[in-house]
């Protein structure tokens, strides 16, 4: 029978860690802080599995380029993110994400997963077969591209005749791929933890600017009516909601005007919400985002029931919205603080458990 994690960690000068990094968009920057805290405390990461943003951070760390990636992420502003957006007229998604992948390729280089110094698994979802797909061989960038294809937002990625999308659809916290790793400690990092405080206020000016820039950037590719069709899609509105605003609408697009900012949802919905004291006002896209978070939290709990982690670190959903990729500095700090707190508590428990075992 394997020794408890407490004894395995206590008996090692550099405890071996298997790490499961969950999906959750920009909250995935917290994974960087978690890994930094582990390294500072002398833990040796010997296996990584990741879904979506967890696949990105896990992949760059397995390639030995986490510090470079963190530096790049911290340099991102709202304007640079706008330049990285890669609009698509495909019905499968409003973004292609190729510019973002180019930036990741520049950091990690042309490396194959089987050549990485740390065993690594990226998890994606086969949309046609309805199954999870594990990438443990092949180009790292292709595995990451498949794992980050948010449904309806980033177009799916075709690999060997399979249409692949975000790993978080079926496996938002991939514990199974690291179950066989020879480690002293298994750590799961979930990005769908309970709220730590009130949700942040919307940033309407940011979203209005995003829409105006999107219209101008896409006008060279297709006509204004096509741009209107693209940005009027529910998935496009969901992107705007996740970017940090309630919603943005325009009455007239014929001359690509500046965007008029309005509250989310039709008037009837707003009146109904206003008539119900004590309930938060949620537009249709906030409802959709919340639905996704609830589903992923339930899937993660189901996974942990079958593959328990020795230590679970939960990043609150309120840390940031899924597409607020300009907030790397503060989200990394949140991850580092949560990991430090969790590891300190675990190490204290380890000391007490070990003492009790010896005395018993």
Swiss-Prot record:
Instruction: Please name the GO terms that the record assigns under molecular function.
Output: lysophospholipase activity
A GO BP entry is: phosphatidylcholine metabolic process
Motif GXSXG mapped to chain: 50-54
Q: Lipid metabolism among the record's keywords? A: yes
Gene3D superfamilies named in the record:
Cytosolic phospholipase A2 catalytic domain
Every PNPLA domain range: 19-179
Kindly give the Pfam families that the UniProt entry links to this protein. Answer: Patatin
Q: Keywords for this entry?
A: Hydrolase, Lipid degradation, Lipid metabolism
Q: What is this protein called?
A: Uncharacterized NTE family protein Mb1092c
Q: Which organism is it from?
A: Mycobacterium bovis (strain ATCC BAA-935 / AF2122/97)
